[in-house]
A protein has these predicted regions:
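Intrinsically disordered, low-complexity regulatory regions
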Residues: 1-91
Length: 91
């Protein structure tokens, strides 16, 4: 058990991420191109992720009822940035 309940928070983040993919891009596998894939192909995906991290972090506390959602988006874009930075290949 972590002092700050990181394990529980990571489970919540995982549930959020899973839900984001359930509602998008329905169809066969070849039709599931995401904006992130296009941005990666032109070399701007990291900038996009960083911009969204800044946007949602800056918005935190300013939209009633959206604080949790904003933080989940920050964490999701941080995970994506980690992936696109190739750190997950450093095992």
């Amino acid at each position: 058990m972590n002092k700050y309940r990181e394990n529980e928070t990571l489970k919540i983040v995982q549930e959020y991420v899973d839900k984001t993919y359930q509602g998008h891009y329905v169809g066969d596998d070849q039709d599931k191109t995401q904006t992130l894939d296009l941005l990666e192909s032109i070399g701007t995906v990291s900038d996009f992720c960083q911009s969204n991290i800044i946007k949602y972090a800056a918005r935190f506390g300013k939209k009633n009822g959206k604080n949790k959602q904003d933080l989940l988006k920050v964490m999701h874009y941080a995970i994506l940035l980690y992936h696109f930075s190739k750190f997950d290949n450093d095992h």
